[in-house]
Amino acid sequence: MTDQSGQRRVVIVGGGFAGLFAVRALRRSASVTLIDRAQHHVFQPLLYQCSTGIMSEGKIAAPLRDLLKKHKNVDCVMAEVSDFDVEGRRVIARRIGGKLIEFGYDDLIVAAGVRQSYFGHPEFARWAPGMKTISDALSIRRRVYGAFEMADTATDPEERRTYLTFALVGAGPTGVELAGQLREVATKTLRAEFRNIKPEDARVLLFDGGSAPLAMFGPKLSQKAASALDKLGVEQHMGSIVTHVDEGWILVRDHDGAETRYDVGTTLWTAGVEAPPIAKVLATATGAQQDRAGRILVEKNLTIPDHPEISVLGDMMSLDELPGVAEVAMQSGLYAGQRIRHRVSGKIEEKPFRYRDLGSAAYISRGKAVVSVGPLQVNGFLGWWIWLFIHIAFLTGVRNRIGALFTWWFAFTRDIRRERTFTTQQIETLRDVYTLPLGPDTATAALEPATGRHAATPETETGATPAAPQGHANVPSDPVQAAGKPQKTAE
């Protein structure tokens, strides 16, 4: 089947790295419809810099239409996919305003990414936001700087100490990077700006169920990271599991089973991810299997078994325990796009997807980062420069790269974080509705008939939230307070 121009129809769900690289690989060999519920592509590895005031959202995100304006074969659609008609080869999505529209396809690529996982406790999200979207980063920015403002006007010493205590759940790259940035905000950026408080007295608590931060980087770099965090003043609580999150406090169980309450003004969740609800919808429609995190199990060519026309890419796919990093998304997108292009040109033979590990990098603080590339392990100042180069190279758009360089120069040489504007009304802003579990209360009713090239379809039902993974290292699958366990309050 083809569209009116005679080209093969390809629908891509998701405008992240996987979706964009698939678009670029297809070139002009197909008519492409790219569907995303946001109208921008965001560089997620730098979201923590947006949340701590270094970067503006415009420097780490770019409009999809602008990025793809030279790709005349690509139509960008802002809508949220809600269902798949596999037999009829249709994608059903909800447009702005609530009406459903459909898109026919010959090949379907689903690269919808992942969302924050609370391991069976979505109620934690209200008091412990994750960081997967621009909305998340801006909400965290308001919470962080708002905490210092609230502490400045607090008259009760205990209340002031609570506002100046920050907890991070999860000591992977995002948790470590955020922890380091929060201490730099307190000890450098804000140090001379307040008269009633000492921002440098702010406590940053880092919790993880594992034995060390950045464990995935290996023992050597993990120890270097732990040492750098110690020097920054980050209080590391390894072997600790957060069992409850509420307004103003968290409950933590250590490796001995003792539970401790910590009074905290801000809790940030960086402990894990899971596939979005649309993965369950796709699995139900195709009969595909899902792993513990809800990701779709795919064949070696990244397609769903018995459905060679449907590819699942990036963080949403499950194959050979590949990590959820940008390089996997990029390479899988390039592979899937080339595979479809080869099929269009009549090339039948195809090779299985092979991931080339380009290494990992994590920023800790100014002049300190860890980088692991195969047998090469670098830390400290050299690692920091390598980190800068990698992230500049991966940023989308020349303007964003140049802007990032100037922003980093000001931030790193003059302790300036210009992106700190917010109002009192914004301090308590809750997280974006898309980051919360989908359900009847978040669904939008259809309001008006759709117009234009996309036909309206009857209302469809989104799938249930995928089952939470069990036995995660940072947070238990069922973190309930154990009866009879000793409980204490942190000093």
Regions found by a protein language model. Name each.
Residues 1-7, 74-167, 257, 268:
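FAD-binding core/adjacent interface of flavoenzyme oxidoreductases
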Residues 127-155, 249, 261-332:
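FAD-site-proximal beta/loop scaffold in flavoenzymes
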Residues 71-90, 183-300, 306, 348:
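A Rossmann-like FAD-binding core segment of flavoenzymes
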Residues 18, 113-116, 179, 273-275:
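Short glycine-rich anion-binding loops that position phosphate/pyrophosphate groups of nucleotides
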Residues 41-44, 117-120, 276-278:
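Short acidic/His/Gly/Ser-rich catalytic and metal-binding motifs that mark active-site loops
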Residues 6, 332, 338-491:
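C-terminal, flexible cofactor-proximal segment of oxidoreductases
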Residues 2-78, 82-83, 166, 173-217, ...:
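Beta1-alpha1 glycine-rich phosphate/pyrophosphate-binding loop at the start
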